[in-house]
């Protein structure tokens, strides 16, 4: 996917959440460990929810099209996040701790990208938009971490 505008970053973020949902759901079916299966099912449902939330955020942001049309290609290129999107996913061979760490790493990188974009922004509408999405992603990352810990404690 070519990233040129903030709208493209939002599409990319939504795609990451969607792919994590699909991979976690698939790996939950393939995993032999009941604990890992529970964790992957939770991650799948959480990522599906995040995909919907990002879509709603985009829809609401369309009313402020100036922010979404902001050019940010060179910022994205400096902070591109590698993600495994095709074929076999490593979740299939991971234990619960490794799954949790990998999932939180994806979210940490997404938060880092939005922090970087926010710090580079000078337009108030763009800064506000990024601040809102950043707050959402940070809150969801904390919720994900807390709930994964509770599943691990079962």
Question: What would you call each of these model-derived segments?
Answer:
Residues 1-31, 96-120:
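Alpha-helical bundle segments that constitute or directly flank the non-heme di-iron/ferroxidase center
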Residues 34-35, 60-68, 151-154:
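Short alpha-helical linear motifs
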């Amino acid at each position: 996917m070519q990233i040129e505008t903030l709208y493209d970053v939002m599409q990319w973020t939504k795609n990451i959440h969607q792919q994590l949902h699909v991979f976690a759901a698939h790996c939950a079916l393939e995993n032999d460990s009941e604990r890992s299966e529970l964790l992957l099912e939770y991650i799948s449902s959480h990522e599906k929810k995040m995909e919907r939330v990002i879509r709603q955020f985009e829809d609401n942001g369309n009313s402020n099209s100036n922010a979404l049309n902001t050019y940010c290609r060179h910022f994205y290129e400096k902070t591109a996040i590698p993600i495994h999107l095709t074929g076999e996913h490593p979740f299939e061979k991971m234990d619960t701790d490794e799954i949790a760490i990998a999932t939180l790493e994806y979210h940490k990188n997404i938060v880092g990208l939005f922090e970087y974009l926010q710090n580079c922004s000078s337009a108030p509408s763009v800064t506000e938009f990024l601040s809102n999405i950043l707050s959402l992603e940070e809150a969801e990352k904390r919720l994900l971490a807390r709930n994964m810990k509770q599943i691990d404690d079962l």
